[in-house]
Amino acid sequence: PAVSLYNLREGNRDMNMGKSNQILIWEELGDSKSLALTYNNTSLYTWGFLDLEKDGPTVIEVPPGVLGALNDMYFRYMEDIGAAGPDKGKGGKYLVLPPGYEGDVPDGYFVVRSQTYGVWNFMRGYVKKGAKEATQRIKGKLKVYPLAKKDNPPETLFTNMSGLAAYKTIPPNDFSFYESLDKLIQEEPIEFLDPVTRGQIAAIGIVKGKPFSPDDRMRKILTDAVAIGNAYARANTVFPRDP
């Protein structure tokens, strides 16, 4: 899950849309040109990634008429937003706090605490009145900014992704899988993983604060392992042959 979400964020960064206030939106709905997890062509998607290490506590002004969620960088559910969230589809202000935050928490927000600095801010817009109306509603109401700049927030920027073929977020199935995982481990507080998982990744050489540099023997083992794991998942989960 961590590598999957890491590569989703890398897809945003490859589009020069990696800042908290930079939001991707599919104004003409999704299409097969964008390669993203569980993606379809009937939803008006919009998403971005928070950077709580850089920005500190961050406000998301959620528009009415959306359905979404916040996930941390281990793909753990944090909170529903929109119709299934505490704003009940009417829109509202969410305040996302970074790991270990002990400062003041102002009133007037739906408060969400994160175990990671990175947070996926994801929602679908209802298109009962058409994609154009949903796009205008979202772009007019969705705002993301640091709490420290609430009195003069920076503009929230949108990029229309419909029809663009450059957006690729699929996790790798070669050795770079482990390099992605190591990069995420180095930039997040290690407490976001439980001790058992920390031990498992340490056994293959991924340790917080240390370089990931397997020798040729271990590199071959890991390269084979990720290819076999990918094939196993495809054969047994993605497209099983059981009736």
Positions of predicted regions on the chain:
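A compositional/structural signature for long, glycine/proline-rich flexible linkers
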Residues: P1-P243
